């Protein structure tokens, strides 16, 4: 890891942040002990009250940042309602952070099917058995549901539930933060007016 902070050589000539994120994620994959793709996901409910929780990033390209969930969960309902979200990655071992926010779209059925099929069989059963974010009267009820769906799909493929898919955050802001001495940190923000717009870049006071 460089100790010199963020320099002009860290960025593409096209002012495009996704390549820099890919490099930082690669560094985190080599450095972080657990789940380098873990990210805090922030949403808001219909009253503007925020919620935040950890999810796992499952894809990133120049279209945006992808994760998967139950659309009937709290986060699923809030995203479907507001169509906006924010993320924050923190890699303590690297003394780095990336924040982003933007509009949210649903991934294609083909993308969701492909990722769902790659999951362990038990996780695919869990997508059917868990009524995510709703009250659970006891652990036995969940285990019973798992057993029932395991029996139902004992042979053959397990189809993807219609309420389970992926979201893609299409960012309008991505900020890269690097820790430096005396809290004189480096902060570089990439901004654009719309998810399809051109990026501009600005250095921020720490």
Swiss-Prot record:
It is an enzyme of class 1 (oxidoreductase). FMN binds at residues 53-58, 68-69, 75, 97, 132-133, 177, 187. Its EC number is 1.4.3.5. The keyword Membrane does not apply. The keyword Flavoprotein applies. PROSITE patterns: PYRIDOX_OXIDASE. GO terms for molecular function: FMN binding; pyridoxamine phosphate oxidase activity. Gene3D superfamilies: Electron Transport, Fmn-binding Protein, Chain A. InterPro entries: Pyridox_Oxase (IPR000659), Pyridox_Oxase_CS (IPR019740), Pyridox_Oxase_N (IPR011576), Pyridoxamine_oxidase_dimer_C (IPR019576), Split_barrel_FMN-bd (IPR012349). Transmembrane segments: none annotated. Pfam families: PNP_phzG_C, PNPOx_N. Binds 1 FMN per subunit. Its cofactor is FMN. This is Pyridoxine/pyridoxamine 5'-phosphate oxidase. It catalyses: pyridoxamine 5'-phosphate + O2 + H2O = pyridoxal 5'-phosphate + H2O2 + NH4(+); pyridoxine 5'-phosphate + O2 = pyridoxal 5'-phosphate + H2O2. Pathway: Cofactor metabolism; pyridoxal 5'-phosphate salvage; pyridoxal 5'-phosphate from pyridoxamine 5'-phosphate: step 1/1; Cofactor metabolism; pyridoxal 5'-phosphate salvage; pyridoxal 5'-phosphate from pyridoxine 5'-phosphate: step 1/1. It comes from the Bacteria. HAMAP family: PdxH. Homodimer.
């Amino acid at each position: 890891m460089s100790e010199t902070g963020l320099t002009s050589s860290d960025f593409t000539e096209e002012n495009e942040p996704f390549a820099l994120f890919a490099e930082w994620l690669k560094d985190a994959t080599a450095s972080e002990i657990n789940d380098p793709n873990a990210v805090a996901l922030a949403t808001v409910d219909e009253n503007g009250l925020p919620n935040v929780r950890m999810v796992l990033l499952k894809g990133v390209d120049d279209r945006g940042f992808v994760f998967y969930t139950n659309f009937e969960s709290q986060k699923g309902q809030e995203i479907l309602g507001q169509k906006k979200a924010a993320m924050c990655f923190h890699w303590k071992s690297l003394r780095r952070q990336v924040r982003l926010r933007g509009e949210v779209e649903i991934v294609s059925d083909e993308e969701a099917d492909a990722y769902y099929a790659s999951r362990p069989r038990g996780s695919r059963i869990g997508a059917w058995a868990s009524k995510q974010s709703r009250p659970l009267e006891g652990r036995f009820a969940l285990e019973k549901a798992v057993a029932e769906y395991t029996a139902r799909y004992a042979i053959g493929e397990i189809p993807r539930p219609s309420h389970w898919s992926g979201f893609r955050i299409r960012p309008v802001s991505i900020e890269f933060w690097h820790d430096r001495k005396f809290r004189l940190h480096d902060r570089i923000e990439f901004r654009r007016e719309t998810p399809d717009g051109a990026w501009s870049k600005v250095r921020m006071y720490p």
